[in-house]
Amino acid sequence: VKNFIYLPFCLFIGTSVAGALPEIPEPFKYGVGGIENGKIYIGLGSLGNNWYMIDTNQSEKKWTKIAQWPTVPREQATATIIDGKIYVFGGIGKDKSGVITLQKDVYSYDIAKDKWEKLMTRPPVSLAGHVSFIHNGHAVSTGGVNENIFNGYFSDVELSKGNSALTEKVNRDYFSKPADDYFLNNHIISYDPSKNQWKNLGTTPFPGTAGSSVIFAEQQIYILGGERKPGLRSVRSWTGELSHDRIKWSELPPVASPEGVSGAYASVIDGNIFLAGGAYFPGAAEKYSNGEYWSHKGLDKAYSKEIYQLIKNDWKKVGSLPEGLAYGVSLPWQGGMLILGGEKKDGKAVSDVIYLKKNDK
């Protein structure tokens, strides 16, 4: 764990508790993670088929390999831990022909048996770039890309290889559309592992996003930022109160204005909501508002290092990460937030473990 600095507004990034947590054995981004009973599990993304576990209850804390992922490696999936099993939903990976496609199979990992199992089920809507959380023993998911549009684009890219004019047309046709025409998923679905059944919880009152951050705490959902379309982020943030499979939504003030972020880290720290990091294209929002729908064309991706806290129903900047970072895993741990891995501005994955905690001084 890197040794960082005290930040203003009673926030601390450092090693006082996490000092014994070693770096991840491999650079890690676009993967999934979860925590149960002090044991942290991570896998997929840049780890390929590898999965690792670390038991933070032990005096000697070290990452150990667990059973390998048994099928197509993937990115932009989600993982939830329910009753001693890790459930992995969706994501994108290369099929047997080498074309990137959305993955529809569902796998569970039995922690006690160190064994993966393919489940006889499929999500009723496409899940990749979505968010998931646990409610009453069910895995709830929303957001993500449209399967037909997403798969169609990468199929066309593959077919156009070697023909630069056709490749340019494929990209122009795909990126030069308004956000609504990507049909991102705004259905809310719930999976019950005990029955191996899916349930329809309706739709969000806002357009679907991809790469949003999610927090579920005290029966309250927070969906923060994300992509409105490829290359264009959202500043919108929402909260929903979940009761008896019904959700009452309210919009929060915008966060990370004016561009928004996707792939940011989010968690509860000492009862407060935090959002950190994330990636965006500076200038894309202005270009889009001027009718340039391929809004990130010619722009460089930027990586935020800002840390925001939701204070009295408004977002306040309360500090900064040591460098811009996005697309890792964030988990609640010991009253703070762990940031596991991520991607920095050169596009490379990192092995860092960062701990954010309130400064009690």
What are these regions (language model features)?
Residues F4-G14:
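Sec-dependent N-terminal signal peptides
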Residues V17-K361:
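Kelch-like beta-propeller repeat domains
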